[in-house]
A protein has these predicted regions:
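Bacterial Sec-dependent N-terminal signal peptides
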Residues: 1-26
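C-terminal PAP-associated
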Residues: 23-317
Length: 317
């Protein structure tokens, strides 16, 4: 299946036809969509054509049509064969991208890799580029044959890449997450470090240059946690180990994190109360000698209600 990337100068956007969330003006039912979680259903199936049936990969070169700029734009397919052809019979979605701050020609993308479109068994697929996205290498999957989902990539200021992924060794094992580290621009990864984790996890890395430089923060859905009741963790040693899971001051799910210029940590997510988006702040999560405390929790009004799986696109992919 074709999986492509568009570049304009040094910015990157991955285009895939999926939409998981939407806003509506009327309040939805007061419920948490607990059916939305990752679990192993189908068995693994190898590619039906042994990755030998190929077609031309997607490729585009052009310029923007803006009246105020004349910017070069190019598109390249990422999940390609060694001969840079499209592989028939596989599929990919939920991409996450990271760029090396020390060398912007080095780019890594991770995604959910389906080797066979007749099975929803997914793996931790990835590809890397060393020439700014012009050409790509697709080695396959981290942990081949192991169920993975929810890929999240980030990088630190030293040029290391990190791949956070839910991983289950067998169908009854649900929601454990591991963080994999690459020191060679995505060519290879370590064996991964268990971080606790859970469904719909996200990750960010402190690049503020302060006390928390290199800290890794992650949170996930509380009611699908591998270490209940916790749904937050932190690494202060570059992903070599992670703190015991802890709770946040409010139950936030489908969330993300961000680090401020002074190293303060923000976590945002949807509340179980319709129409509420919450933001929690910690100023001491950056301090490796302290357990994070949370100084404030704010409610953000978006002028509507976030709903999941709207009629326009009920599957979200």
């Amino acid at each position: 299946m074709k999986f492509r990337i568009i570049y304009s100068f040094l910015s990157a956007t991955l285009l895939l036809p999926f939409l998981g969330y939407a806003q509506q003006w009327g309040p939805p039912d007061l419920q948490v969509e607990e059916e939305s979680y990752e679990k192993q259903d189908d068995p693994y199936l190898p590619n039906a054509y042994n990755n030998q049936k190929l077609s031309p990969a997607y490729r585009y070169d052009g310029r923007s049509g803006s009246r105020t700029s004349n910017t070069e734009i190019f598109t390249r397919q990422v999940n390609v064969s060694p001969s840079h052809k499209n592989i028939l019979g596989d599929a990919a979605n939920e991409p996450s991208i990271a760029v090396n701050p020390l060398n912007e020609s080095e780019i890594v993308i991770g995604w959910r890799q389906f080797d066979n479109v007749n099975s929803n068994f997914r793996q931790a697929g990835w590809g890397y580029s060393s020439d700014g996205g012009q050409t790509w290498t697709f080695p396959g999957a981290i942990d081949p044959g192991v169920f993975h989902s929810d890929p999240v990539l980030d990088y630190d200021n030293a040029g290391n890449f990190y791949y956070n992924s839910l991983a289950s060794q067998h169908p009854t094992e649900e929601y454990p997450c591991y963080v994999y580290k690459s020191g060679d621009a995505g060519v290879s990864w370590n064996n991964g470090v268990y971080m606790g984790g859970g469904d719909k996890q996200w990750m960010t890395i402190d690049r503020s240059g302060g006390m928390g430089e290199g800290n890794i923060y992650s949170s996930w859905t509380s009611y699908y946690s591998h270490c209940p009741p916790g749904f937050f963790t932190r690494s202060t040693d570059g992903g070599n180990s992670f703190d015991s899971c802890s709770i946040l001051p409010e139950d936030m799910y489908w969330g993300t994190q961000a680090v401020g210029i002074n190293g303060e940590l923000y976590i945002s997510g949807r509340s179980i109360v319709p129409g509420r988006i919450l933001v929690a702040k910690s100023v001491d999560a950056q301090n490796p000698a302290r357990s994070p405390t949370w100084t404030s929790v704010s409610t953000v009004e978006l002028g509507g209600y976030i709903v999941y799986r709207p009629d326009v696109n009920p599957e979200g992919i």
